[in-house]
């Protein structure tokens, strides 16, 4: 498969000692096989420097590893990286790990215990690794990072990384969006396109976090109180939109309650010859007679996000 490269992005300084060094993929239209990405995406990574040590957060999709290296080297030689923090190990974040380990022999990886298992399989070798737990810290020299356990947001391995000095929270997929914004800032979204970003924010939530709504509420409660910048793994970083996005997530993750008090049932089916449809219709009729609110969906014609919303 030929990869269309229209991903030019330089390192962007976000705060003192914090840079965005990820890459853009504006041409992407389908993410993870089934999720539509109408406005492309970005594979975000962040460089955090202290007075003594330097950490990279995430390692992007493997097809964009050299672009990541190029962005890092606008700031420092990639071989001088001391730490790689993996908040989550899905291949769009961890694809460059093996190549980075080869390039940086003194690199130490920091991640959760489950992430260590996944990364060992991904890299197919042992590597220097420090497993971190909730509340553990990393001193970069005048800048301390604290790790926050965030399981099922959206994998068992997920953690947040909190930069107290800069009031910056690195959340990986949480609060993100498949929306390719070259400025890497929510303040850079053109006002006329804001509604598209907000629509994609909901689509992203439904497809990725819809199955984990209790974990979403826990994750929101674990966020530090004075966050000024949220650095996600996809889409623009958040500063002016932090409160808005958090409120959206809390609303979308709240248990659904019908005003009339009726319980709801979703029936999802696929029928080649109409037999399964007849069964679905019969089940819907019986459940409705019992006082339940029933919605049926034929997966052949329903959009994935519609099915996901019904299930979740």
Language-model features: locations:
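Conserved beta-strand hairpin/beta-sheet module of binuclear metal-dependent hydrolase folds
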Residues: 11-74, 160-163, 167-171, 276
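Metallo-beta-lactamase
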Residues: 12-16, 54, 110-240
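Short hydrophobic segments within beta-strands
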Residues: 21, 171, 233, 268-270
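Active-site neighborhood of phospho(di)ester-bond hydrolases with catalytic His/Asp-centered motifs
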Residues: 57-59, 81-89, 109-112, 169-172, ...
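Active-site metal-binding motif and surrounding structural segment of the metallo-beta-lactamase
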Residues: 63-110
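Short acidic loop-to-helix transition motifs that present clustered carboxylates
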Residues: 90-92, 116, 299-305
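N-terminal beta1-alpha1-beta2 submodule of the flavodoxin-like/Rossmannoid cofactor-binding fold
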Residues: 242-312
């Amino acid at each position: 498969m030929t990869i269309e490269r229209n991903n030019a992005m330089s390192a962007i300084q976000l705060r003192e000692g914090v840079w965005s060094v990820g890459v853009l993929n504006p041409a992407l239209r389908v993410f993870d096989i089934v999720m539509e990405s109408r406005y492309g995406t970005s594979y975000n990574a962040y460089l955090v420097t202290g007075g003594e040590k330097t950490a990279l957060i995430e390692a992007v999709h493997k097809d964009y590893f050299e672009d990541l290296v190029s962005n890092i080297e606008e700031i420092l030689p990639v071989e001088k990286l001391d730490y790689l923090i993996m908040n989550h190990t899905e291949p769009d974040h961890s694809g460059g790990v093996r190549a980075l380990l080869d390039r940086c022999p003194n690199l130490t990886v920091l991640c959760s215990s489950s992430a260590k298992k996944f990364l060992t399989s991904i890299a197919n070798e042992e590597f220097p690794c420090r497993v971190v737990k909730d509340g553990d810290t990393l001193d970069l020299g005048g800048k301390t990072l604290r790790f926050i356990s965030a399981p099922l947001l959206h994998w068992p391995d997920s953690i947040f990384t909190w930069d107290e000095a800069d009031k910056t929270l690195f959340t990986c997929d949480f609060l993100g969006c498949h929306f390719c914004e070259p400025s890497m800032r929510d303040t850079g979204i053109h006002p006329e396109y804001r509604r598209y970003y907000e629509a994609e924010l909901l689509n992203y939530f439904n497809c990725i976090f819809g199955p984990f709504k209790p974990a979403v509420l826990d994750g929101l409660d674990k966020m530090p109180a004075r966050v000024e910048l949220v650095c996600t793994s996809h889409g623009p970083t958040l500063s002016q939109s932090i409160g808005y996005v958090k409120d959206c997530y809390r609303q979308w993750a709240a248990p659904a309650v019908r005003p009339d008090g009726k319980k709801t049932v979703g029936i999802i089916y696929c029928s080649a010859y109409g037999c399964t449809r007849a069964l679905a219709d019969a089940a819907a009729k019986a459940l409705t007679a019992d006082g339940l609110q029933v919605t049926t969906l034929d997966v052949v014609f329903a959009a994935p996000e519609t099915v996901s919303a019904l299930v979740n």
